[in-house]
């Protein structure tokens, strides 16, 4: 029995110590730090708006894309809808999905004869991207302006207000947050 305790006692103590450090202390410190330093992001970047009935309600997250299909809204990337998004770029299935999405865009705005930006006809890896490229937003300006009866200048200004720049001025591409633009467009009615 003494030999058994000599072998297992350090293992059990090590297990309990690592469980305490890795399972309680570290996650607790990180959670508290995130809540203090990055309060908004740590809590889901929830956007609250004044609703039609005068109350304030949660309308979405700035970090998770919502589906918009109405022509008066800025429309984001295609949702993956349970379809694998890691298809080979040259596969027949990917080609058919892209062709279907191109047809949808032409049906939505038959007067727009510009080339559809790639991010509007391909799905993201996560399927929930909240942002689109500046080119994808610019592609939709005329339609939104026409549908809402406002100037293209107003639409462009709203898009510019909700465009994030490159990280550190050189990393990545500027992106436009779809939900924030659509909420700003809806605020014009008020």
From Swiss-Prot:
Compartment(s) where it occurs, according to its Swiss-Prot or TrEMBL record: Cell membrane
GO biological process: potassium ion transmembrane transport
Molecular function GO labels: ATP binding; P-type potassium transmembrane transporter activity
Record's bilayer topology term: Single-pass membrane protein
Domain of life: Bacteria
Database matches in InterPro entries: KdpC
Pfam family, one: KdpC
Gene Ontology CC terms, in alphabetical order: plasma membrane
Keywords from the named record: ATP-binding, Cell membrane, Ion transport, Membrane, Nucleotide-binding, Potassium, Potassium transport, Transmembrane, Transmembrane helix, Transport
Regions that span the bilayer: 13-33
Coarse class of the protein's main subcellular location: membrane
Function: Part of the high-affinity ATP-driven potassium transport (or Kdp) system, which catalyzes the hydrolysis of ATP coupled with the electrogenic transport of potassium into the cytoplasm. This subunit acts as a catalytic chaperone that increases the ATP-binding affinity of the ATP-hydrolyzing subunit KdpB by the formation of a transient KdpB/KdpC/ATP ternary complex.
Binding partners and assembly: The system is composed of three essential subunits: KdpA, KdpB and KdpC.
HAMAP family in the cross-refs: KdpC (MF_00276)
Family recorded in the similarity comment: Belongs to the KdpC family.
Stated name of the protein: Potassium-transporting ATPase KdpC subunit
Native source species: Listeria monocytogenes serovar 1/2a (strain ATCC BAA-679 / EGD-e)
